[in-house]
């Protein structure tokens, strides 16, 4: 093997795909360029003995990690890289030679001139008295089974060893008990993963349990949870959802559960929760039991001796957490008040699924019924239909075979109506068109009356033109009695041509006879 492959940094760069896979398994992201820069240029300046070619010496890695994780003057961007270095040293891959595993770096604590120590940082959160309710006795660690050492010649603390109380690594440094004992210039919680029970290595046996290490909740987490959630009496859903999530993700111990109850709930709320939880302890038949010995065994009020590194201890903790969540849900119920359930109405822009969730939460809070049970599906469905928005309610009531629809089917039908609703722009355009159509209908009678008036005026003007001898009108006249019109040289009296009526000889003869008769 050449010289280039004998240094830790060259080994990691030559097997970068394996290193990156290791980082992904640790839920962190690393870059090859930064990996080389931190190892060869940045960490050697910390003055803890880190060589530019890198090292797998755990004592040096822990020293660098302490500086990286410092609250004041730390290096958050370097956290993923030193975490992966530590994992490579604790769980070396096959391509790491034995000589690299046992390499010893001398003078690991030589200070570097020109790097003054950072001043102590003032506390972020106020020192409230409610965070000290369980300060005595301090949170355990319970006795943890240590994994076997990596190699007989390995130097540095084993991976499963509990940190010393004077070394404020890990989330415990943020708690009040650790903060009181830790020196001011050495504070810095390890915030990589803050879990009360954290896996610290591979199982001691091929089919054994993964060993867990205890890390108590930090005061910052407790303060944030208390400040950012309404009280349990005001809105039980907030804290119930929080604790249900914590029971699944953080795997709290019995002491952690008591600390959460002390910090987040009042005395009356805490008593109700514990009482409801003990009512929900399941017996051997899977139904709630009333046997005192089984209740005390599954949900003890005094601190039990459960070892979380054994299968029996983990099972006990799992049952305890599940029972505590059942107690939270039971204590969240109020006296039966169906009027409160009927007050839950769907908002104008509220999705049907969100409305259904609010409706079911009202059932859980104000009725003794479980809305998700099979027997309550019909009641919840009728309430969902009757209290939906008007357009959705109208659609659901017209469905054929409504009694055969499940709650999920009703939500799907409601979603169709909800997503077919017009947008704000479409609504404005529709209202504009409706207003224009209404204006046209209102103006239509006026236009009709105006047309009649204009027709009458035109007719009157035509009549006036005929009376004044308008030739154009005369030419267009047609005889009313059906007689043909006269020619221009035709007599109107005798109908002969060549003279007019005043010159008609027949008509003149008659007149002369009458005149002669008068003379006689």
Curated annotation (Swiss-Prot):
Signal peptide: none annotated. RNA-binding phosphoprotein p12 is phosphorylated on serine residues. Keywords: Capsid protein, Host cell membrane, Host cytoplasm, Host endosome, Host membrane, Host-virus interaction, Lipoprotein, Membrane, Metal-binding, Myristate, Phosphoprotein, RNA-binding, Viral budding, Viral budding via the host ESCRT complexes, Viral matrix protein, Viral nucleoprotein, Viral release from host cell, Virion, Zinc, Zinc-finger. A motif (PPXY motif) lies at residues 139-142. One of its GO terms (molecular function) is structural constituent of virion. InterPro entries: G_retro_matrix, G_retro_matrix_sf, Gag_P30, Retrov_capsid_N, Retroviral_Gag-Pol_poly, Retrovr_matrix, Znf_CCHC, Znf_CCHC_sf. A motif (PTAP/PSAP motif) lies at residues 116-119. GO terms for cellular component: host cell late endosome membrane; host cell plasma membrane; host multivesicular body; membrane; viral nucleocapsid. Residues 419-442, 478-489 have a biased composition (Basic and acidic residues). The record marks 125-126, 195-196, 454-455 as: Cleavage. A zinc finger (CCHC-type) spans 489-506. Residues 137-151 have a biased composition (Pro residues). GO terms for biological process: viral budding via host ESCRT complex. A lipid is attached at residue 2 (N-myristoyl glycine). Residues 110-199, 419-489 are annotated as: Disordered. Residues 461-476 have a biased composition (Polar residues). This is Gag polyprotein. It comes from Gibbon ape leukemia virus. The gene is gag.
């Amino acid at each position: 093997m050449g010289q280039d492959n004998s240094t830790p940094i060259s080994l990691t760069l030559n097997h970068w795909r394996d290193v990156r896979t290791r980082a992904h398994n640790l839920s962190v992201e690393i870059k090859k360029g930064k990996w080389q820069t931190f190892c060869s240029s940045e960490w050697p300046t910390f003055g803890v003995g880190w060589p530019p070619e890198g090292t797998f010496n755990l004592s040096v890695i822990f020293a660098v990690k302490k500086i990286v994780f410092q609250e004041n003057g730390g290096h958050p961007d370097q956290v993923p890289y030193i975490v992966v270095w530590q994992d490579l040293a604790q769980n070396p891959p096959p391509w790491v030679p034995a000589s690299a595993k046992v390499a010893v770096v001398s003078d690991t604590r030589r200070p570097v001139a020109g790097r003054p120590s950072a001043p102590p940082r003032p506390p972020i959160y106020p020192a409230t008295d409610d965070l000290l309710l369980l300060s005595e006795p301090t949170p355990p660690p319970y006795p943890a089974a240590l994994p076997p050492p990596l190699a007989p010649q390995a130097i540095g603390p084993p991976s499963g060893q509990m940190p010393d109380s004077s070394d404020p690594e890990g989330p415990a440094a943020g708690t009040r008990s650790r903060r009181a004992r830790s020196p001011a210039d050495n504070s810095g919680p390890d915030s990589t993963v803050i879990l009360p029970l954290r896996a610290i290595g591979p199982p001691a046996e091929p089919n054994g349990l993964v060993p867990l290490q205890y890390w108590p909740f930090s005061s910052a987490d407790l303060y944030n949870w208390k400040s950012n959630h309404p009280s349990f009496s005001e809105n039980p859903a907030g804290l119930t959802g929080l604790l249900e999530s914590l029971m699944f993700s953080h795997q709290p111990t019995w002491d952690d559960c008591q600390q959460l109850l002390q910090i987040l709930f009042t005395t009356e709320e805490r008593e109700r929760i514990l009482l409801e939880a003990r009512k929900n302890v399941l017996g051997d038949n899977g139904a709630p039991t009333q046997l005192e010995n089984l209740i005390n065994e599954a949900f003890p009020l005094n601190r039990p001796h459960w070892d979380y590194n054994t299968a029996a201890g983990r099972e006990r903790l799992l049952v305890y957490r599940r029972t505590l969540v059942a107690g939270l849900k039971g204590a969240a119920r109020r006296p039966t008040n169906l009027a409160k359930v009927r007050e839950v109405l769907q908002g104008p822009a509220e999705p049907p699924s969100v409305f259904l969730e609010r409706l079911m939460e009202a059932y859980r809070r104000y009725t003794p019924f479980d809305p998700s049970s099979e027997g309550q599906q019909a009641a919840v469905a009728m309430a969902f239909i009757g209290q939906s928005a008007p357009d959705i309610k109208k659609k659901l009531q017209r469905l054929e075979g409504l009694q055969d629809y499940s709650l999920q089917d009703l939500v799907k039908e409601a979603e169709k109506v909800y997503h077919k609703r017009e947008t704000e722009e479409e609504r404005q355009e529709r209202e504009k068109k409706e207003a224009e159509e209404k204006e046209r209908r209102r103006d239509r009678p006026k236009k009709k009356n105006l047309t009649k008036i204009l027709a009458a005026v035109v007719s009157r003007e035509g009549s006036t033109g005929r009376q004044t001898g308008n030739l154009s009108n005369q030419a267009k006249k047609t005889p009313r009695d059906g007689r043909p019109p006269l020619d221009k040289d035709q007599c109107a009296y005798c109908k002969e041509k060549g003279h007019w009526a005043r010159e008609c000889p027949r008509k003149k003869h008659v007149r002369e006879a009458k005149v002669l008769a008068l003379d006689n």
